Amino acid sequence: MKAVGLVVEYNPFHNGHRYHLAQAKRLTGADVVVAVMSGDFTQRGEPTILDKWSRTLAALQNGVDLVVELPVADAVQPAHRFAMGALSLLNDLQVADVVFGAEHPDWDFAAMVKAEQDFNQAAFHQFNNTYATQFNQQLEAVTGHALTDPNDILAFAYHRAKAAGDFGFHLQPIQRVDNHYADQQLTGAISSAGAIRQAVKGHQDVTETVPVQTASALAKLTTIPNWEQLYPLLANHLIQTPAPLLEQTYQVKEGLENRLKEAAERHRDFTSFLKAVKTKRYTYGRLMRVAFYLTLNLSDQDMANYHPYHRVLGFTAAGQAYLHQVKKELSYPLITKVNQRMKNAELALDYRAGKLYQFFGTPEQDLTRGPIRLV
């Protein structure tokens, strides 16, 4: 059986995603679709609007055959780490192709990756701008293109990861079909995930934009997960923890701990807290991830101890058959059910993330849950 791989968040699963996976299957002639999906928190460190099980079910009922969770240690990361983590899993699962949306699928991303060797490295030691801004200035000077759209950024990261990882699959970008990620207005049947989330918050009807499974799950929401709800946990942690201990948190370095601590003492809501910490050096995306690391109490040692694995969230009959085909050749552990030992060992970070997500009133995310089976 031939498999095509997708890297997804499905936040939530919508009609654009259904188009993407149908195109992926058509372009590659694959027998099965394998999706590596973020769990309950996105790449930016935000809680997903629906939990990973609801999103897995919608994916399986709309064309995906196997859903594997991207561990939180790789899921809540900048594009380069996110891409490497996801593609490592797909490569181990022996997919033949990885298909992804991009704003400019005609760009030669592989050539853009090679162009990095011509960058002026001295320019990156200036701290009056974020690394991303300085990187784009260099990239545009060398290639004529700047990475300003999120899917183009990921496309570049996928090509960089493939070059570094020597992966065996083929990368295939396709045209993104929904409205721009920053657009907050619905644009008919094909609308962005961001616009759909905003519409749900505003109590608008989104049934035209999502499959019936997603619409049903959204209709049952009693609260929309957001950082304002988690902020008391974050603020308390920052206020109660001495700065030297905060510095042991992953990605909290170079005085950022003092800035975070001071902001937590002064601000009572997450939005004003984030604005107080923001500088030209730190993007909002990075600060959102740092907020997640702090609330999860994710340390440098936690990250050093992390090793990849395949946590299966669900499969169809075809997905089950494919998993049986490849499982004996996997380099990473295959996990279908979480036990008491795992929650304190290899799955400790994902277990903690699931417990954090339960603050939104959701059921247990890990210990009592096995893969969803549509067989």
Curated annotation (Swiss-Prot):
GO CC, alphabetical: cytoplasm
Name of a matching Pfam family: HIGH_NTase1
Reactions accelerated catalytically: cytidine(34) in elongator tRNA(Met) + acetate + ATP = N(4)-acetylcytidine(34) in elongator tRNA(Met) + AMP + diphosphate
GO biological process terms held by the UniProt record: tRNA modification
Keywords in alphabetical order: ATP-binding, Cytoplasm, Ligase, Nucleotide-binding, RNA-binding, tRNA processing, tRNA-binding
Binding site residues for ATP: 7-20, 101, 151, 176
Compartment annotation: Cytoplasm
Taxonomy, superkingdom: Bacteria
Top-level class of the enzyme under EC nomenclature: ligase
Function field: Catalyzes the formation of N(4)-acetylcytidine (ac(4)C) at the wobble position of elongator tRNA(Met), using acetate and ATP as substrates. First activates an acetate ion to form acetyladenylate (Ac-AMP) and then transfers the acetyl group to tRNA to form ac(4)C34.
Protein family according to the UniProt entry: Belongs to the TmcAL family.
Cited NCBIfam families: PRK13670.1 (NF010191)
Protein name: tRNA(Met) cytidine acetate ligase
Organism, scientific name: Limosilactobacillus fermentum (strain NBRC 3956 / LMG 18251) (Lactobacillus fermentum)
